[in-house]
């Protein structure tokens, strides 16, 4: 293909071409368009530099690129060692990062490691290291296996943790000792085994000390204990040292950022996979995703501190309580300056929760400037366009730091962070796992799904690398005050809030608190659906994502509103903001393209109804808060089947399905009862968000086993 200069066609460098099947494996085929330079011949005379003429042509070379899309496990492992790294550089990192979603580590090693022959003992006085000639005799596949194992050990060392013996790591260590003795990979395996054993010994020592010095067990108090509530109402938060808000805004924000950074750096990306994270509340799954659970606990601790400090001591005057609200707004602003979006989101969620939001007299005493800051910060996490604002800002923060780095500058000169709100990525992965099948026709592993998961995990890892640039020192007094801050349960928060400002019967506009103060923020999906491909055409058009209706979008932008009059709370960024805890299913995903199989190439978005299906969220009314589960609702689904599937996802015995009723949650605190025999798809309100609630019928008294933990 040739075109004159200045008339170059604006063609994409990589164009989808179709699929190929080879030995039971499915490959996606693309055409890569690469430019090659060609100048005019040299002028007469040797040694002269060629000068391009004005009519120089642009030459392009088109090459065929194949990427494995689906295959059986044996073929995937074979691709690890024999695949073309230049054509498909993302295969190995994607497989290593996501393999635990479809196969255990031991089985992969069973395919990957050939049984090594016993090496002959070296003669006395002869170095056992390989000579250069022996290295050259290594087979290509053997070198590839060693390379894959080296990447695996460096990037995913926790995959080999299997206490107490760490058998998988032992097998790798033996193989590398035979295949690459003295090499970097063998040394990595040795060091990792030493670290695991040392860590286990340290944990055992700490456990022995704890058992030796721990006193009698404390009596656990229920969250709704009247004793705890009386203490909160009469005495307020009690601690021997200073309270958290006694410290400066900068100090508190920096310590919150320090804790968030440490926890985020420990997050194992594979624990964020939707197939793993969605199993966390099942019986016997308490140990799943511990590093992600730690970030959830920290988020909930911060929201609890805000609630406890603002609602404590009901006898405070409205002006005094307003000062506490203002200080938390300034702390949130400082977190934004530190690029800590995790604590920023936690503080805003607490201030927007109903127990604090309903305090009109306290909000009326807040100064105009903090209110303006609060509105601007709240816009970051606005529900508009499926939380597109927070995603755009996070991407802008990442891009800014790359652009601000001059050529040749040291990485230490780059700004640290940002610390993301992990819930966004968790929900992206959960919804991706829900939307795309694990296997395709012929029981082939859908590796295209794993590639899309890897794109999200890779971004998490990039953010972790950037967060290593933070240089913050711990302040033990502030950390102690944070731990000592009294935590209020959701029921306590609401009761104390009503003591501070009793609900006025003559004020119907006062927001009515729901008991469903959720443990989960909105779970919604924005998956870009691909257009039906024509023969020889592109199977998908990522440039045309489908828009999604975001449940609970604000009617108007807070930045355009006038400050509220005295005695009114500030405008909330959304009509529903009761959540005070980090979602376990987290935040809505953003618009990323998803390639689907021809049989399922059109997946409805959460809150968006197609002619045949819709993704809905179903929660269950219990004492654990709202734990939402996503369900694909088709036009054939009747209420009993939807109730049964929802109970199954909430780990409630299915024989109890007849004891439950399904309600659609409508705007304005209204609910729509779905009759038992009705077709849910047609009985629901299509204009309302796809949020549903399961509630026990009157006269039934089963105890639910579902838990948000």
Swiss-Prot record:
Residues 502-511, 533-551 have a biased composition (Low complexity). InterPro entries: RA_dom (IPR000159), Ras-like_GEF (IPR008937), Ras-like_Gua-exchang_fac_N (IPR000651), Ras_G-nucl-exch_fac_CS (IPR019804), Ras_GEF_dom_sf (IPR023578), RASGEF_cat_dom (IPR001895), RASGEF_cat_dom_sf (IPR036964), RGL3_RA (IPR030750). Residues 612-699 form the Ras-associating domain. This is Ral guanine nucleotide dissociation stimulator-like 3. Pfam families: RA, RasGEF, RasGEF_N. Guanine nucleotide exchange factor (GEF) for Ral-A. Potential effector of GTPase HRas and Ras-related protein M-Ras. Negatively regulates Elk-1-dependent gene induction downstream of HRas and MEKK1. Residues 552-576 have a biased composition (Pro residues). One of its GO terms (biological process) is small GTPase-mediated signal transduction. The lineage of its organism: Eukaryota, Metazoa, Chordata, Craniata, Vertebrata. Interacts with GTP-bound forms of RIT1, HRAS and MRAS. The modification Phosphoserine is found at residues 506, 510, 553, 568, 572, 577, 600. PROSITE patterns: RA, RASGEF, RASGEF_CAT, RASGEF_NTER. Keywords: Guanine-nucleotide releasing factor, Phosphoprotein. Gene3D superfamilies: Phosphatidylinositol 3-kinase Catalytic Subunit, Chain A, domain 1, Ras guanine-nucleotide exchange factors catalytic domain, Son of sevenless (SoS) protein Chain: S domain 1. Widely expressed. Expressed at high levels in the liver and kidney. Residues 64-201 form the N-terminal Ras-GEF domain. It comes from Mus musculus (Mouse). Residues 248-503 form the Ras-GEF domain. One of its GO terms (molecular function) is guanyl-nucleotide exchange factor activity. Residues 26-55, 203-225, 395-416, 502-604 are annotated as: Disordered. The Ras-associating domain plays a central role in the activation of Ral-A GDP/GTP exchange activity. SMART domains: RA, RasGEF, RasGEFN. Residues 611-706 are annotated as: Interaction with HRAS, MRAS and RIT1.
């Amino acid at each position: 293909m040739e075109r004159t200069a200045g008339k170059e066609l604006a063609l994409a460098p990589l164009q989808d071409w179709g699929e190929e099947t080879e030995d039971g494996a499915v490959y996606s085929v693309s055409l890569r368009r690469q430019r090659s330079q060609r100048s005019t011949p040299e002028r007469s005379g040797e040694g002269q530099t060629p000068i391009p003429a004005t009519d120089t042509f642009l030459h392009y070379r088109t090459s065929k690129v194949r990427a494995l899309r689906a295959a059986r496990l044996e073929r995937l492992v074979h691709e690890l060692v024999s695949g073309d790294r230049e054509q498909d550089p993302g295969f190995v990192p994607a497989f290593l990062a996501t393999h635990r979603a479809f196969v255990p580590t031991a089985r992969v090693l069973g395919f990957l490691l050939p049984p090594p022959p016993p090496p002959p003992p070296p003669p006395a006085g002869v170095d056992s290291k390989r000579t250069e000639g022996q290295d050259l005799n290594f087979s290509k596949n053997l070198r590839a296996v060693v390379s894959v194992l080296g990447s695996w050990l460096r990037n995913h060392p926790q995959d080999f943790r299997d206490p107490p013996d760490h058998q998988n790591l032992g097998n790798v260590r033996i193989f590398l000792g035979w295949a690459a003795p003295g090499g970097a990979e063998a040394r990595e395996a040795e060091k990792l085994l030493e670290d695991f054993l040392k860590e286990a010994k340290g944990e055992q020592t700490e456990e022995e000390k704890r058992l030796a010095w721990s006193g009698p067990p404390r009596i656990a108090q229920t969250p709704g204990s009247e004793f705890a509530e009386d203490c909160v109402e009469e005495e307020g938060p009690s601690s021997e040292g200073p309270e958290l808000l006694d410290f400066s805004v900068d100090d508190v924000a920096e310590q919150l950022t320090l804790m968030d950074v440490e926890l985020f750096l420990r997050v194992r990306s594979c624990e964020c996979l939707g197939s793993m994270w969605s199993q966390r509340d099942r019986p016997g799954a308490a140990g799943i995703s511990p590093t992600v659970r730690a970030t959830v606990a920290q988020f909930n601790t911060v929201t609890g501190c805000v609630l406890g400090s603002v609602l404590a001591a009901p006898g405070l005057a409205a002006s005094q309580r307003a000062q506490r609200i203002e200080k938390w707004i300034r702390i949130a602003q400082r977190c934004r300056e530190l690029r800590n979006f995790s604590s920023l989101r936690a503080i805003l969620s607490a201030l927007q929760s109903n127990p604090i939001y309903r305090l009109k007299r306290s909000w009326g005493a807040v100064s105009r400037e903090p209110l303006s800051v609060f509105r601007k910060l709240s816009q970051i996490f606005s529900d508009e366009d499926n939380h597109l604002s927070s995603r755009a800002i996070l991407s802008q923060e990442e891009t800014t730091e790359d652009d601000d780095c001059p050529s040749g500058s040291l990485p230490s000169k780059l700004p640290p962070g940002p610390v993301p709100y992990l819930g966004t990525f968790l929900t992206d992965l959960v919804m991706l796992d829900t939307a795309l099948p694990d296997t395709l026709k012929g029981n082939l592993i859908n590796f295209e799904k794993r590639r899309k998961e890897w794109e999200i995990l890779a971004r998490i890892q990039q953010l972790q690398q950037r967060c290593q640039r933070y240089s913050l020192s711990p302040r033990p007094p502030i950390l102690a005050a944070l731990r000592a801050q009294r935590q209020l349960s959701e029921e306590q928060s609401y009761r104390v809030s009503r003591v501070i400002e009793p609900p006025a019967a003559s004020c119907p506009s006062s927001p009515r608190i729901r008991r469903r103060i959720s443990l989960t923020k909105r779970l919604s999906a924005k998956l870009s659906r691909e257009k039906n491909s024509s023969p020889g055409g592109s199977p998908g058009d990522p440039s045309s994502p489908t828009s999604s209706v975001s449940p609970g979008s604000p009617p108007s932008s807070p930045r355009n509103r006038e400050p509220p009059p005295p005695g009114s709370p500030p405008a909330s960024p959304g009509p529903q903001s009761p959540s005070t805890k980090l979602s376990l299913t987290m935040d809505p995903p953003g618009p990323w393209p998803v390639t689907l199989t021809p049989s399922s190439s059109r997946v409805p978005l959460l809150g968006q109804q197609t002619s045949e299906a819709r993704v809905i969220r179903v929660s269950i009314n219990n004492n654990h808060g709202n734990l939402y589960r996503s369900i694909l609702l088709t036009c054939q689904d009747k209420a009993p089947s939807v109730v049964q599937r929802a109970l199954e996802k909430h780990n409630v015995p299915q024989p109890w399905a007849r004891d439950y009723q399904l309600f659609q949650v409508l705007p304005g605190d209204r609910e729509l009862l779905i009759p038992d025999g009705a077709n849910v798809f047609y009985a629901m309100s299509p204009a309302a968000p796809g949020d549903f609630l399961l509630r026990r019928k009157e006269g039934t008294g089963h105890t639910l086993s579902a838990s948000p933990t």
